Amino acid sequence: MQRTVNIQAVESKLKFTFSQPRLLVTALTHPSYRNEFPSDGEDSERLEFLGDAVLGLVVTEHLFLLFPSLNEGLLSTTRSALVNAEACFNYTQKLSLGEHLLIGRGEKMQSHRGKISAYANLFEAILGAVYLDGGLAPARQIIVPLLPNKEAILPLMLVNPKNRLQQFTQQTLKVLPTYIALPWSSEDGTPGYHVQVFVNEKLWGEGFAGSKKEAEKLAAKQALSTHDDNKN
């Protein structure tokens, strides 16, 4: 059975009124819902693509202005922590937008991972819709209040071993670590990555994992464990 969208309720949560409400309906339409009701307009995928870029720009600008002396590497990794799927899921939860998602009956949302993905995509799609309807300013007004304050962002930078290693090598050696990723397979044949981290062309650590990002974290963690006396 097709569901209707309470446009005013969503607009109230966003504190933004659409001049083109159809954009909001599209943003709320998960691809699985459109598969069940193909005559019911577009799904949210294209708006997700646009919203991802809008979110990245606003967060980049916010960090750039908030931390005028922070280098590009730390700005980049901090931005990643504020725009990843987990972060977007949390933004959706803060605004209580998930209840408005139009999703197909057969779509798996029982798992936490499935819910994170669906809600993260929803947030990006809504940002894309807001941007098309009103431009960057209203999108910024939605995003910035959801971001952690400066004091909360500072420790966030050091939670990731890559950030801690970068800070350590910059402070002590005035250089940045370099990561090299190689294909790797686990004992059961699952593909993944073997990442090596070098500092001044010397191998400092290695990591093995299914994703390159996780392998980089493990390599950085090993490098810290053998080179940073203050790691604890």
Curated annotation (Swiss-Prot):
The active site is at D52, E124. Residues 160-229 form the DRBM domain. GO terms for molecular function: double-stranded RNA binding; metal ion binding; ribonuclease III activity; rRNA binding. Its EC number is 3.1.26.3. It catalyses: Endonucleolytic cleavage to 5'-phosphomonoester. Residues 7-135 form the RNase III domain. Its cofactor is Mg(2+). It comes from the Bacteria. It is an enzyme of class 3 (hydrolase). Keywords: Cytoplasm, Endonuclease, Hydrolase, Magnesium, Metal-binding, mRNA processing, Nuclease, RNA-binding, rRNA processing, rRNA-binding, tRNA processing. One of its GO terms (biological process) is tRNA processing. Mg(2+) binds at E48, N121, E124. Belongs to the ribonuclease III family. NCBIfam families: RNaseIII. HAMAP family: RNase_III. Homodimer. Digests double-stranded RNA. Involved in the processing of primary rRNA transcript to yield the immediate precursors to the large and small rRNAs (23S and 16S). Processes some mRNAs, and tRNAs when they are encoded in the rRNA operon. Processes pre-crRNA and tracrRNA of type II CRISPR loci if present in the organism. This is Ribonuclease 3. The lineage of its organism: Bacteria, Pseudomonadati, Chlamydiota, Chlamydiia, Chlamydiales.
